[in-house]
Amino acid sequence: MAFEEMIKKALDESRNNCRLGDTLEEVQEIQNYIKNAEKIYIPNKNGIKVDVLNKVLREYNLPSAKILQINTNEADSNRSPAFAKAIMALDVCDADLIIARGRLGLPGSGSLLLFVDNKGRILTCGTSPSHAISQKTLEDAVYELSLIHI
């Protein structure tokens, strides 16, 4: 099943009150979308997250992501800063895939790593607790979170 057809089918099921949850086929379509992405961007103002995410992308034989050097501080005033970063990136580049990481919500709420398609739809994501609790370095937190979702 093609990616867009899979989305339409799931929406039709929801509309018709017969959706029973995600299927393995849907998960595989999302994985295929990620694996077939050619233009991958990471909105960030420094390269630390980009270096770590590119290490993971290489481990899965995926193309390297490019840093999209935009000031994402404004995203922190949003209710969902990580998603706001992804949308900011889509507004300024022609990407197949955006990988954005930022605060989950309120200060202290933890971090959210998002994989977003070229239409701003969340493909997958992962959360991690605040660094104040986990005591993990930025590099370790990003690496561990991204491994799970590719």
Segments the model singles out, each with a brief description of its role:
Residues 36-56:
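N-terminal beta1-alpha1 ligand-phosphate binding loop
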Residues 55-65:
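Short helix-loop-beta junction
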Residues 20-35:
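A short, basic/flexible loop-to-alpha-helix module at the beginning of a structural domain
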